[in-house]
Amino acid sequence: MLTLIVILAVSYLIGSIPTSIIAGKLLRGIDVRDYGSGNAGGTNAFRVLGWKAGLAVTLLDIVKGAVAAISVVVFFEAHPLGAMPDINPVALRLIAGLAAVFGHVFTVFAGFRGGKGVSTAAGMMFGIAPVSTLIVLAVFLLTIFVSRYVSVASIIAAIAFPLVILVRKYLFDLGEGLDYYIRMFNGHVFIHDSLDFHLLIFGMIVAFAIIYTHRANIGRLLSGNENRVTFGRHA
C-alpha cells in the first residue's frame, strides 16, 4: 500500500510541474493565465508565447505523462517500499498516469489552477499504447489543420482514442496488444503496445474528462468566440 501511495504522490508532483507558467515567467516575465484563454496549458502557451514556446511546453507536458506511466512505476517495481499492490500492470500505469494528469490540472505549485490535461494524458497513453496514440495524434493534427481549433482537435482526439483501442482489439482481433523490438543505438528496444481492457475503459473516462475540462471552449465555439490557431504568428 505504501508503494502505491508513493507512486501516486510522485506522479502527481511530476504532473504538477507548471511548464507553461515557468515558460511565461522565463521568456516574458508574465503568468500565461493572465492572457489568452487564462489556461496554463500548451494551447494558451501557443497563443501567448508563440509557437516555439508552445511546442516546447506541449512536448514537456507529454513527457510528464509518459514518465509517470512508465518510469515512476518501473522504478518502484524495481525498488518497492514494501509489497507491490496487487493490481493489473496496465491498470497500475494508468492510475499513475491519471495522478500526473490530475497534477497538471490541479497543480500544487500554482494555486491548483493548471491546464486541461490533454498533453499529459497523451503522454500517459503513448507510454502504454504507442501505436494507438500515434493514430490518434494523426487525427489530432488533421483536425487542427482543417478546423484551426485546438480545442476541437483535443475533444475529437480524446473521443478517438477508446474507439481506436476498440477497433484494434476486437475488429482486428489483436488481443491484449503487440510487442515490438526496435533497433536503436546498436541494440533493440522492447516496446509493448497494450490493448488491455482496462485501457479501453480508462480511455472512455479520459474522453469524458477532456470534454468536461473543455466546457468553456465548447461554449465559445457555440457562440463563435473561440480563438483559432494561426501558426507562425509569434517568433
UniProtKB/Swiss-Prot annotation:
SMART domains: G3P_acyltransf. Keywords: Cell inner membrane, Cell membrane, Lipid biosynthesis, Lipid metabolism, Membrane, Phospholipid biosynthesis, Phospholipid metabolism, Transferase, Transmembrane, Transmembrane helix. It is found in: Cell inner membrane. One of its GO terms (molecular function) is acyl-phosphate glycerol-3-phosphate acyltransferase activity. Its EC number is 2.3.1.275. Disulfide bonds: none annotated. InterPro entries: G3P_acylTferase_PlsY. This is Glycerol-3-phosphate acyltransferase. It comes from Prosthecochloris aestuarii (strain DSM 271 / SK 413).
